[in-house]
Amino acid sequence: MLIEFSVTNFKSIRERQTLSMVASNYYKELVDENTFEVESEESFPRLLKSAVIYGPNASGKSTLVEAMEFVDNFVCTSSNESQAGDRVGVVPFRLSAETRNGDSQFDVAFFEEGVRYEFGFCANSERVTAEWLYAYPKGRAQRMYTRYYNDDADSYHYVWGKNFLGGRRRTDWKNSTRPNALFLSTAVQLNCEQLQSPFNWFKSRIATLDPSILSASYTMKHFEERKSAILEFLSAADLFIADIKIDKIKFDPALVPSDMPPGLKEEVIKNMSGKEFAEAKFYLKSVDDGELIEFADDEISAGTKALFNFSGPWIDVVSRSRVLFVDELDSSLHPLVVHQLIRILHNAGKPVQMVFTTHDTSILGHKGILRRDQVWMIEKSDQQASILTPLSDYSVRDDEALEKGYLGGRYGGIPFVKDLTIGN
């Protein structure tokens, strides 16, 4: 599970910004509901099940989610889905000459299979310039490896920890690691069993979602195996969907627009011929006799479709103890539905975490949804760099109206809206 995530010099983030999922011992509310104890042989504080990030438009809320998505993809694919010479997908803070030409840095602390790990790397568009991994079995620090690029020598220097096994194979892993790839990714691809556990945390635990662009493909692909859970999920959101069926539809050349250029039309038909597409059909009960009435996709509201699209990934996250990063959780969803989603996660009965951004301040106004150490604010500095601040940095009273305080500007993270007069 996620302990801490830090980002330096990435997009709107200039100085190091850290999101911590460690629960504060100071707050006594919702301990059983919103925090959990890590199964580990070391004594470690409880972790939070969720964290919310508030901030105005263009403040950098999405940047943190994008940073984790980049790290996750880079760990999982840098060794096998890129070629020598491909650019690394980092984007530095561009409003300063110093950072514009500097490296981006990412640090992740997490638990996997009862062991704490600290993994991180620095990179620019051309190469990884540093990489490190430490393990803490029973709380004792063990270096697995460190990797640094020596610019003067144009070569990499590796230091192996005494507990990092592999013998001569470590040299093979090192020599096979391209400048634009991670050693962690490469070594696992070459069957390094000792690094499989931390690699699997990124591969199997981390998930990032943007509900505004989430399609129904994942939910439909896994629909039959999770049908009852999906219907229960939609019912919990107070949607009166009695049944859903997924039909397979073969591609029909007649659907290709007639005004499409002949050459392009021929290519489309050639590429799509014989392919099948999934289509969801929704059924509601008749108010007269309970008969199931079919509704086509275009007859279903955008909110219902958004929840259906979201249900598959959401159930996957909750059932598999994953760590979910969601950008704009409230997109197309009613505030009360958002509240219910958070409660479902908190009551999952197993370790599961979510970090999400939102503009929905009603979450702050409802007691029993979030603890004060689960709330974060992000805003731009005078240098237009994103600054992430926990609500716990402010002197917040037990009985303080958080929504009112936030909207009143007490904690930052709100837009400064100027008066605007439109001329005739």
PLM features per residue range, with description:
Residues 13-15, 113-117, 127, 139-141, ...:
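Short acidic/polar mixed-charge low-complexity motifs
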Residues 60-102, 175-234, 343-348, 352-353, ...:
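An exposure/low-complexity boundary signal
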Residues 35-52, 56, 65-119, 124-128:
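Conserved P-loop NTP-binding catalytic core
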